Amino acid sequence: MDVNQESLKLHEELRGKIEVVARRHIETRDDLSLLYTPGVAEPCREIAKDYEKSFTLTRRSNLVAVITDGSAVLGLGDIGPAAGMPVMEGKCALFKEFGGVDAFPLCVDTKDVDKLVETIALISKSFGGINLEDIAAPRCFEVERRLKEVCDIPVFHDDQHGTAIVVAAALLNAMRVTGKQMGQMKIVINGAGAAGIAIGKLLISMGFGNIVMCDIDGIICEGDEGLNAGQEEISHISNRNHEHGALADALRGADAFVGVSRPNLVTAEMVSTMKDGIVFAMANPTPEIMPDEAKRGGAAVVGTGRSDFPNQINNVMVFPGIFKGTLAVRAREITEGMKIRAARALAALVTDEQLSADYILPSALDKSVADTVARAVAQEAREQGIARA
């Protein structure tokens, strides 16, 4: 039985990967009167007087909404909200299993930005944070931006920022392996969608050198026609040498390649034109180039999104800890500084003794990672003065 059929069978057996569990059993009349009526009226009155008590008198302080419109689910595309539910349930299970964070899946049946933003904003008082998931670009940029403006809790599009953080951590350690210098690197990112643009912006914020963005038409340059808002924004701060051409042209002389695009776009010959290349081919399930092919082309470090190859670059190492730390200090937002701190903390988990070309990140199954990321994020929030607890 292949993995798809085995997964389907497991889902049929489980009939859902998460459940609601009461934190206190209701067995006596006293239990009933304290946890529900009449006693529950008192915490209601307290919250009505002091809104902040909604975080201390309810589970809100540890509850994240995982929300999709089903428009960009995995590599399946626009399959609709109901079909996106298995992924949202899985995400919630990972939140709990790796970060101890309670999460609830919500699949919203609209592609209209106004309706989606309004719906999420209206239910936001039930949660301590919002994790946006599998919303297609470029709408995802506007949805996140507008929600940040109207919600008083952190809003985080994991496809963008979780991916960017784990890629940044992987690059930091690939630099340690190869001896490359951050400010002198040329990094080519193929795929100018949600993940690619977020990766580019974070790497630029961290001080990485020349970031060159590519899409299906090749290198993105400032002034190109037909760019969406996200691509237009990053075109102003990337490609500082004003290069033109195809992906192969961009890779010539590059130090690193980050692929968040489509299978089999890169060849060994293209990798051979790089300088001691770092290759992160993250298209799933088939990467832009297979690891053995990249190494045949001379790649020094290779990572993919898959668990069956070394150096899995998976954002499960990021989002549980990001939210755990943010919720712990009740920060209203997840800032650029908190993302950078998370990336550096994740990279630092790999010691000099452990570090090698085939080991640049901790295991995606290492449950200590979330605590490390959470502590770093919480400390950064305190230092920035945005912690409320």
Task: Give the ranges of each region predicted by the language model.
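Rossmann-like adenosine-cofactor binding region
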Residues: E232-A300, R306-D308
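Glycine-rich phosphate/diphosphate-binding loop of Rossmann-like nucleotide-binding domains
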Residues: L74, I79-G99, C151, H157, ...
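Solvent-exposed alpha-helices and their adjacent loops that cap or buttress functional pockets
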Residues: F55-R60, K96-E97, L122-S124, K148-E149, ...
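N-terminal ligand-binding/catalytic initiation module
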Residues: M1-V155, A374, E380, A387-R388
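Short, ordered loop/turn segments at secondary-structure junctions
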Residues: D69-S71, I79, V108-D109, D134-A137, ...
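Adenosine-phosphate binding glycine-rich loop
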Residues: D158-D159, A281-A389
